[in-house]
Amino acid sequence: MKSVYEECPVYGKGLITLRKTNNEDLEELLECYSDEKAVPLFNSDNCNGDNFNYTTIERMRQAIEFWEVSYKNEEFVRWTIILKGMNKKIGTIEMFHRNADDEFNHYGILRIDLQSKYEIQSIIEDILAISNEYFFEAFEVKGILTKAIQKAEERICALKKAGFKPVYKKVMGYDDYYCREI
């Protein structure tokens, strides 16, 4: 199996397709990253102060360029979430293998950024189904961690249904994480 950094796979499940983010996604992703209802649900932990609230095309372009450089450096993969049927780009996910001197060494971090009107259980379930089926092997991780703040009720329901359990301690100094292990 090729590394996700050699050849980035396209995944599909239910309502969505995931494919590597590129500059063609710029304008539609700006709708997600400028959505003031969505931004509080994004996981910006350990992102050097970036809260992912982008309000200009130029700032969105810079983010996509950074994601591309990070991909080339094998730091993380950022996929665009495309709603099938409408071919609408509704957000992104990020996934990476975490190396650390703590109990979550060799776990993956999954970030899910969705436009607020698409922050619904069925779409999140499809994202998690892809994650559960492919990401453990693709990223060589023994568990996947993702964040869901308490008011993210649809996300929390989807996480529990997909076998994720709350982590009742801080992860990298932060609260509100859920984990699924192999």
Locate the predicted segments by residue.
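Surface-exposed alpha-helical segments enriched in charged/polar residues
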Residues: E65-V69, A129, E133, E137
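Conserved GNAT acetyl-CoA-binding A-motif
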Residues: E137-A148
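GNAT-family acyltransferases
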Residues: M1-K117, Q150-E154, K160-I182
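Conserved acetyl-CoA-binding loop-helix of GNAT-fold acetyltransferases
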Residues: I120-Y134, C157, K161
